């Protein structure tokens, strides 16, 4: 079985996340997708509480399930109650799926900072890496800046210009976000009054 790990704060999950997951599952032939909710860097600044983000991630997984994608939400990082390291998360997932192929899905910006990660050198021995990069030519830099050989990492052109920050800002400004979010997540945000300025 091919298992993929997709982590983030998901504050909130949006259509860009959804599009990436749909694209990854089809392109990489992923059998199971794990959505890992990380510690929230925006806590106390209009960000949702940990449990709310986990619930929105569950709604997001439900959206994936509706189109036939097997998805589950992991709260392992949240349960640690402190910032965790990607290598530790991967080791945890590997312990749950010891015999399966494992791929880490990450964005290009995160990948270019990978040398600052704990034990980054051993990541290729634990999982495959799929790096989703912006498709505009001006955003592409020389592959020589990548810390691994070209055969270790799969580069995938993908561009969906949307961020959770934009959504939080639009909600705070009372601007519409209906076309940026799965409907279940939009309803959750409205119901719980998330991202509104005090």
From Swiss-Prot:
GO terms for biological process: NAD biosynthetic process. Coiled coil: none annotated. InterPro entries: Cyt_trans-like, NadD/NMNAT, Rossmann-like_a/b/a_fold. Pathway: Cofactor biosynthesis; NAD(+) biosynthesis; deamido-NAD(+) from nicotinate D-ribonucleotide: step 1/1. It is an enzyme of class 2 (transferase). It catalyses: nicotinate beta-D-ribonucleotide + ATP + H(+) = deamido-NAD(+) + diphosphate. It comes from the Bacteria. GO terms for molecular function: ATP binding; nicotinate-nucleotide adenylyltransferase activity. Belongs to the NadD family. This is Probable nicotinate-nucleotide adenylyltransferase. It comes from Chlorobium limicola (strain DSM 245 / NBRC 103803 / 6330). The lineage of its organism: Bacteria, Pseudomonadati, Chlorobiota, Chlorobiia, Chlorobiales.
């Amino acid at each position: 079985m091919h298992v993929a790990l997709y982590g983030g704060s998901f504050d909130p999950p949006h259509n860009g996340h959804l599009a990436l997951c749909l694209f990854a599952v089809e392109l990489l032939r992923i059998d199971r997708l794990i959505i890992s909710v990380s510690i929230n860097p925006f806590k106390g600044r209009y960000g949702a509480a940990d449990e709310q983000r986990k619930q929105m991630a569950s709604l997001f997984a439900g959206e994936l399930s509706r189109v036939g994608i097997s998805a589950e939400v992991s709260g392992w990082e949240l349960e640690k109650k402190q910032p965790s390291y990607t290598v530790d998360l991967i080791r945890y997932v590997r312990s749950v799926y010891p015999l399966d192929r494992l791929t880490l899905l990450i964005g290009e910006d995160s990948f270019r900072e990978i040398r600052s990660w704990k034990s980054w050198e051993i990541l290729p021995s634990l999982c495959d890496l799929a790096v989703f990069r912006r498709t505009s030519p001006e955003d592409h830099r020389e592959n020589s800046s990548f810390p691994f050989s070209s055969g270790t990492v799969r580069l995938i052109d993908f561009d969906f210009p949307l961020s959770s920050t934009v959504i939080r800002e639009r909600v705070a400004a009372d601007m519409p976000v209906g076309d940026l979010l799965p409907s279940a997540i939009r309803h959750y945000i409205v119901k719980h009054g998330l991202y509104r300025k005090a």
